Regions:
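C-terminal segment of classical bacterial N-terminal signal peptides
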Residues: 15-24
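Bacterial N-terminal signal peptides that target proteins for export
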Residues: 1-10
Length: 234
């Protein structure tokens, strides 16, 4: 009897392991006090999976502080000014400063720039983004309109990506996305960390074009400032 009970308990324990992991992995996005967009001319849209859980754009915050944009999330979100458009060959870059690494979460979350935005603000919006984490890795992902990944679920580690000294410490990343002929590249802190053929991006289920609106992208429960958001023609 004891042996049978032990076997049954072991089976139950094994069955529960993935369930517990899934529950622990579901970190809910917070609602930021005084949220919304207060920067004239700017717009935003949260991810569809965030909206399906009852989140709204007003639960994240985009504000202007001097020459910087100050973002606090909230649900994962993209922000843009519709006047910011890029066509042909170009580079979009910005500098992101997380003043207190992981101050709103117990693990790192990413932020970066996006390009090739089309149908922005609608359920059919598409764009590509490159984003960095303060632990030394980066991701290249997009929406077309369903989410897609270019370098895997966890992204890639790269020495070019700055690492915070620890929780509560500052970390800064300069992130750029470039369209150069038949390729699209992501550079972080001056080093190219990823390059993809344009044909692998402008295709069914991904981008409509590499021409389009550019802006900034933040994961949920993250806070950082953005400076020097610029587009340069190649």
């Amino acid at each position: 009897m004891g042996s049978a009970y032990g076997s049954a308990a072991a089976i139950v324990a094994i069955m529960l392991v993935p369930v517990v992991s899934v529950v622990q992995g579901q970190e809910e996005a917070r609602a930021v006090a005084g949220g919304g967009i207060s920067v004239p001319g700017w717009a935003g849209k949260i991810d569809a999976n965030e909206a399906s859980r009852g989140q709204k754009l007003e639960n994240a915050k985009l504000a202007k502080e001097g020459n910087a944009l100050h973002v606090t999330t909230g649900p994962a979100v993209a922000y843009w000014n519709p006047a910011n458009k890029a066509t042909g060959n170009y580079t979009v870059k910005a500098t992101f400063t997380e003043p207190k690494y992981m101050n709103l979460n117990d693990h790192p979350h990413p932020y970066g720039v996006f390009i090739a935005g089309n149908d922005m603000g609608t359920d059919q919006q598409s764009y590509l983004y490159c984003a960095a984490y303060g632990k030394g890795n980066f991701i290249v992902r997009g929406f077309g309109p369903a989410a897609f990944q270019m370098n895997g679920r966890g992204g890639e580690m790269n020495d070019a990506v700055h690492k915070a000294a620890g929780p509560g410490q500052p970390v800064t990343q300069e992130i750029a996305l470039s369209v150069k002929g038949d390729n699209v590249e992501c550079a972080i802190n001056g080093k190219t960390v990823a390059s993809y053929p344009k044909a692998d991006l402008v295709t069914s289920g991904k981008l409509k074009s590499t021409d389009g609106i550019y802006g900034i992208r933040f994961g949920h429960n993250t806070e950082a400032t953005v400076t020097g958001l610029t587009m340069t023609k190649q």
